[in-house]
């Protein structure tokens, strides 16, 4: 189904289902003998959403060999491995910001992210989660039913990031006069190019000097029409459909040229340092990523930025 500027979703459909897919990957990774991440809430949240395919993956009932094409460059197991290092990257970003004295954290498009419940935040930290109202309500109710307690002053901010969300954030208690740590994890591909620019402008306007931003860039902006990338994704998701999970990830992304995020932010007063997925995998002694089209493999897709 084609995207529209005002489409909405729950956690079992459309863009919302990608949040559940990511949570299932975290749950699966947390079950490893020597896990790189600890997310005790991922599995019960995925169970509560009720998508059978994702529940089976999260709980270990479904084996990668049953789903992934052994000759394909990318699949469910590969995605889960890359999600592990992505999660570690953003976890460490928040921990580093807290150690530096930043006491406001903002999770943009939080989905089933449970960092407000599982990270060891300093006692005076406020964590803001911004996402669609139905997503936030579902997560809050599910975690309350589990008896989970936030590890910070957790504020839910129901808003659509494609539109006017800064006012909602301020109403939630955000103080633009104090530094903040922001993350945009797995978000930009699901925003139209102009909405990506507006979001970065809003973050800049709301950020006091010393604020930090970590983001995952959408590398498909200039290469999105690459038949090789599209075929890689569609080959992987073909196995999902055979197991009853119909999610066209490729169709959920917005096409069109985009600003390169680090250059855009550098022009707005941020200092940026980039990292590739390959570097993150190597840092944890994990297998290298599959071969990507020329021009993609060496482009950083993770950026940590400091204002001022």
From Swiss-Prot:
Pfam families: LCM. GO terms for biological process: methylation. The keyword Methyltransferase applies. SUPFAM superfamilies: S-adenosyl-L-methionine-dependent methyltransferases (SSF53335). Its EC number is 2.1.1.-. The keyword Protein transport does not apply. GO terms for molecular function: methyltransferase activity. It comes from the Bacteria. S-adenosyl-L-methionine binds at residues 131, 160-161. Coiled coil: none annotated. Keywords: Methyltransferase, S-adenosyl-L-methionine, Transferase. It is an enzyme of class 2 (transferase). Exhibits S-adenosyl-L-methionine-dependent methyltransferase activity. PANTHER family: S-ADENOSYL-L-METHIONINE-DEPENDENT METHYLTRANSFERASE YKTD-RELATED (PTHR43619), S-ADENOSYL-L-METHIONINE-DEPENDENT METHYLTRANSFERASES SUPERFAMILY PROTEIN (PTHR43619:SF2). Belongs to the UPF0677 family. This is Putative S-adenosyl-L-methionine-dependent methyltransferase MRA_3827.
């Amino acid at each position: 189904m084609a995207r529209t500027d005002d489409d909405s979703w729950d956690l079992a459909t459309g863009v919302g289902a990608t949040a559940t897919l990511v949570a299932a990957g975290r749950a699966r990774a947390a079950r490893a003998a020597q896990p790189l991440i600890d997310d005790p809430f991922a599995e019960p949240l995925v169970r509560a959403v009720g998508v059978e395919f994702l529940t089976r993956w999260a709980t270990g009932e479904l084996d990668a060999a049953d789903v992934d094409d052994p000759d394909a460059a990318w699949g469910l197991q590969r995605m889960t491995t890359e999600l592990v290092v992505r999660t570690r990257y953003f976890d460490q970003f928040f921990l580093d910001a807290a150690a530096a004295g930043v006491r406001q954290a903002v999770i943009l498009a939080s989905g089933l992210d449970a960092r407000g419940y599982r990270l060891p935040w300093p006692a005076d930290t406020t964590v803001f989660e911004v996402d669609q109202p139905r997503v936030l309500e579902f997560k809050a109710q599910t975690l309350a039913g589990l008896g989970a307690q936030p590890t910070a002053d957790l504020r839910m901010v129901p808003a659509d990031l494609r539109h006017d969300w800064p006012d909602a954030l301020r109403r939630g208690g955000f103080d633009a006069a104090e530094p903040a740590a922001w993350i945009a994890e797995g978000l930009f591909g699901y925003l139209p190019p102009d909405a990506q620019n507006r979001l970065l402008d809003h973050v800049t306007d709301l950020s006091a000097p010393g604020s930090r931003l970590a983001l995952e860039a959408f590398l498909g902006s200039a290469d999105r029409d690459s038949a090789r990338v599209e075929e890689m994704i569609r080959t992987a998701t073909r196995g999902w459909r055979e197991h009853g999970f119909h999610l066209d990830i490729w169709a959920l992304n917005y096409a069109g040229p985009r600003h390169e995020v680090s250059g855009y932010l550098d022009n707005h007063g941020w200092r940026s340092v980039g990292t590739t997925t390959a570097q993150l995998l190597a840092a944890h002694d994990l297998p290298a990523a599959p071969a990507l089209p020329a021009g993609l493999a060496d482009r950083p897709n993770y950026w940590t930025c400091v204002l001022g």
